[in-house]
């Protein structure tokens, strides 16, 4: 039976490239001169650490990160910005968590949406992905179009299309 998987994966190399591009832009921008500004990608625990001189620079850094992610085809919805925290040196820091995988709640919403569509397909939650199977590839393509039209709060990719 034809099937495909609905997943949420982040291309870490592209995210690394986006972070490096932000670092280069910070080095060349006039408003970041003579201020401490850091951006680091921690691949192991899937987070980005931001450090800036004040909240205005932090917002600018956040905007740059989001725009560079868009340029590198990384969906900024996978970035969860935590609260801005002051440091002891009068600066501000912020952690950005990189969300990968589909949570149980989102997976249940996806399955419910597929079942409500009355298409002849089955959806099953498997760890951090949703497997959709059906008899016809056309039905599976309709499901893909249906899910692309909805907003689930996480970017969705459709992989492993097997006929």
UniProtKB/Swiss-Prot annotation:
The record's annotation in CDD domains points to: YajQ_like
Q: Does the keyword Nucleotide-binding apply?
A: yes
Which residues does UniProt assign to the signal peptide?
none
* Origin superkingdom: Bacteria
Q: Give any Pfam family that matches.
A: DUF520
Q: Which GO terms describe its molecular function?
A: nucleotide binding
UniProt keyword DNA damage, yes or no: no
Any single GO CC term annotated in Swiss-Prot or TrEMBL for this entry: cytosol
The UniProt function text for this chain reads:
Nucleotide-binding protein.
Under PANTHER family, the record lists: UPF0234 PROTEIN YAJQ (PTHR30476:SF0)
The protein depicted here goes by the name Nucleotide-binding protein DvMF_3058
Name its species: Nitratidesulfovibrio vulgaris (strain DSM 19637 / Miyazaki F)
């Amino acid at each position: 039976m034809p099937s495909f998987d609905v997943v949420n994966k982040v291309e870490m190399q592209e995210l690394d490239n986006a972070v490096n591009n932000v670092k280069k832009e910070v080095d060349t921008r006039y408003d970041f001169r003579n201020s401490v500004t850091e951006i680091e990608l921690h691949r192991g625990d899937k987070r980005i650490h931001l450090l800036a001189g004040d909240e205005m620079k932090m917002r600018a850094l956040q905007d740059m990160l989001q725009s560079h992610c868009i340029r590198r085809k990384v969906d900024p919805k996978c970035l969860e910005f935590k609260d801005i925290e002051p440091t002891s040196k009068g600066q501000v820091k912020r952690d950005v968590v990189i969300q990968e995988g589909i949570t149980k709640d989102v997976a249940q919403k996806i399955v419910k949406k597929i079942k409500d569509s009355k298409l002849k397909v089955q959806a099953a939650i498997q760890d951090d992905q949703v497997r959709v199977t059906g008899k016809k590839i056309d039905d599976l393509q309709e499901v893909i179009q249906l899910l692309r039209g909805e907003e689930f709060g996480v970017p969705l990719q459709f992989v492993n299309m097997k006929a």
